Regions:
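Short, flexible N-terminal segments of the mature chain
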Residues: 14-42
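Generic structural motif
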Residues: 11, 23, 85-89
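Acidic, low-complexity intrinsically disordered segments
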Residues: 35-93
């Protein structure tokens, strides 16, 4: 099972969080984008733009932060953080 945790932070306080699960037989990349889309839907946000810094941070740590410069519209928080908390087993694919 693939699980991603989405969190909204402001002034070092957690305002909202949600966990998205995905059991589909799909690539990791597709699961990440689908989970991010669901997190943004739950939080009523537009989808953030993946900057080179967010991509490289996510590739290294399976975790990244989308700050104000990643969103087209104004956001009332400091950043949206996403983190993969459970990966599919390689042998299950």
């Amino acid at each position: 099972m693939f699980r991603m945790w989405g969190k909204i932070w402001k002034d070092n306080h957690l305002l909202k969080d949600t966990v998205v699960e995905n059991d589909a037989k799909d690539t990791r990349t597709h699961k990440i984008f689908q989970a991010l889309e669901e997190i943004c839907y739950d939080f009523d946000l537009g989808k953030p733009i993946w900057l080179s810094s967010t991509v490289s941070e996510f590739q290294r740590h399976s975790k990244t932060r989308f700050r104000k410069d990643s969103f087209i519209e104004e956001i009332p928080f400091d950043y949206l953080e996403i983190q993969v908390i459970e990966e599919d087993d390689f042998y299950d694919l």
